[in-house]
């Protein structure tokens, strides 16, 4: 048995799971659902630290990225095939939209979830650098909301106040959104996603080493 086959089995999936030869099984869907729920929990915990404050909310994408890397990468390891990352992105997007978040974030979650699936698939979901890149790409999905504060501040504020956000909150956000804030947000999200992803890869490596082989 080759190393890739052992790696796949140690991750709890059939040895041929990453070859795209079959669709998602019931077990795969259950695993995807569990990890999607965990991802949402960690994302909300990260968001809860900053999102309620109109000055600190700009650092929410970085905080969410810092907490979700291990979950995202473990999902790829457990179900190394096309589909789970798309499902995660779609479910997260649907929940964001249903809970009153700006529609651009929901749309970005769906689109970047699909992009992440393609990127990880280039390495058959076993190439660590590509899996890490997939997570970093998806971690930028909150920017689909915040970007509109610069692109269309009036429309952005009108949409969110129409869905329950206080006008005072939006006014403070607008005053805080200086020219340097947008690139700083992107950089912080990328750096935090990189750190979180590396932690996730290290945790996976330790799991593989306990199983008697190296990742």
Model-flagged regions — what are they?
Residues 2, 17-87:
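Hydrophobic transmembrane alpha-helices
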Residues 2-34, 38-41, 173-215:
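Alpha-helical transmembrane segments and their cytosolic interface
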Residues 36-44, 91-99, 137-146:
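Aromatic-anchored segments of alpha-helical transmembrane domains
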Residues 41, 109-146, 197:
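Short helix-perturbing small/polar motifs within transmembrane alpha-helices
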Residues 57, 132-206:
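Membrane-embedded alpha-helical hairpins and interfacial helices in multi-pass inner-membrane proteins
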């Amino acid at each position: 048995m080759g190393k890739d086959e052992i790696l796949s089995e140690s991750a709890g999936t059939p040895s041929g799971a990453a070859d795209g030869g079959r669709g998602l099984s019931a077990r795969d869907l259950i695993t995807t659902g569990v990890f999607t729920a965990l991802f949402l929990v960690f994302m909300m915990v990260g968001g809860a630290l900053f999102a309620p404050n109109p000055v600190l909310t700009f650092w929410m994408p970085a905080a969410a990225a810092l907490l979700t890397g291990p979950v995202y990468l473990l999902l790829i390891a457990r179900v190394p095939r096309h589909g789970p990352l798309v499902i995660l992105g779609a479910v997260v997007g649907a929940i964001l939209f249903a809970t009153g978040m700006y529609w651009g974030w929901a749309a970005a979650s769906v689109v970047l979830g699909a992009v992440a699936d393609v990127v990880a698939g280039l390495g058959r979901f076993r190439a660590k650098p590509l899996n890490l890149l997939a997570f970093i790409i998806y971690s930028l999905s909150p920017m689909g909301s915040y970007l509109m504060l610069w692109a269309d501040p009036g429309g952005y504020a009108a949409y969110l106040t129409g869905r329950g956000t206080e006008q005072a909150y939006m006014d403070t956000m607008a005053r805080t959104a200086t020219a340097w804030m947008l690139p700083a947000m992107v950089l912080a999200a990328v750096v935090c996603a990189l750190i979180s992803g590396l932690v996730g890869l290290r945790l996976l490596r330790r799991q593989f080493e306990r199983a008697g082989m190296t990742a």
